[in-house]
Regions:
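Positively charged, low-complexity terminal tracts
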Residues: 1-77
Length: 77
């Protein structure tokens, strides 16, 4: 049986996300669940990989923000 240590939920457009930090007899892990259009997808990240996972997500967000910033630049007249 899993014990939920911390959890957050959010709604983005038509998708519902549940982010939970859990623990069971095999260890601690992050569980990210996406529910949309009657389908559910889940990603499990062991606690030993959380720092790497966080760094990878941060890097992708920084790259996405840089891409958005460069595409929103209006040329001078």
């Amino acid at each position: 049986m899993d014990t939920i240590i911390a959890s957050r939920e959010l709604q983005v457009e038509r998708k519902h996300f549940s982010i939970e930090f859990r623990e069971n007899e095999r260890g601690r892990f992050l569980r990210i669940t996406e529910e949309a259009h009657g389908r559910r997808n889940t990603v499990i990240v062991p606690s030993t990989g959380l720092n790497e996972f966080n760094a990878a997500v941060d890097a992708v967000i920084v790259a996405a923000n840089a891409s958005n910033a460069s595409s929103n630049v209006t040329p001078a007249a």
